């Protein structure tokens, strides 16, 4: 029994390493309207990420988060399918379907930032500036890596657009643990 406990504890430690606990601070801050998308929407679910073998259904959470953030800020909807096509045409993806962040920043109107530190400070600063941070989480707190878009805070919780869910979720659904923070926002030209 002790052996099983030790193995379980070791696995849990390895799954959670590298993440930071982040909690919402300050008053409620809600968007006028949160644009939500699902990565598995049949209109784009089978679209490939660039020239890779990966599809929006399997690996499109990040693109869906970016599409949501840009749609909220630009006051013009851009779907994950449309954004994926734009990213593919502009060589934003590497051969494995990973986003090359510098390539996004070279596209007219798009700005991208990769934070070296993962803390609530970066998330709060993004929200206060009217931007929507993208955070890497683990599904159900312990599962595979996944990206969600933080769209605001309410009652001491961060509200998230999860591209695998129909409704807004909270960061506590992922253990309040973030493994990376990214930001893509739209600047009018």
Predicted regions and their residues:
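Active-site-adjacent structural segments surrounding the nucleophilic cysteine of cysteine proteases
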Residues: 1-90
């Amino acid at each position: 029994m002790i052996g099983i406990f030790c193995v379980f504890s070791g696995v849990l430690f390895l799954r959670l390493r590298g993440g930071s606990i982040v909690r919402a601070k300050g008053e409620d801050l809600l968007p006028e309207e949160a644009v939500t998308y699902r990565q598995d929407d049949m209109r784009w679910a089978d679209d490939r990420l660039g020239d890779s073998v990966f599809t929006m259904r399997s690996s499109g959470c990040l693109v869906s988060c970016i599409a949501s953030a840009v749609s909220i800020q630009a006051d013009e909807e851009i779907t994950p399918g449309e954004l994926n096509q734009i990213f593919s045409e502009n060589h934003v993806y590497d051969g494995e379907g990973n986003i090359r962040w510098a390539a996004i920043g070279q596209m007219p109107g798009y700005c991208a930032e990769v934070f070296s530190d993962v803390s609530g400070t970066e998330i709060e600063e993004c929200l206060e500036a009217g931007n929507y941070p993208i955070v890497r989480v683990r599904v159900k707190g312990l599962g595979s890596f996944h990206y969600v878009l933080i769209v605001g805070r309410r009652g001491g919780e961060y509200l998230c657009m999860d591209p695998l869910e129909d409704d807004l979720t909270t960061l506590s659904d992922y253990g309040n643990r973030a493994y990376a923070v990214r930001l893509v926002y739209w600047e009018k030209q």
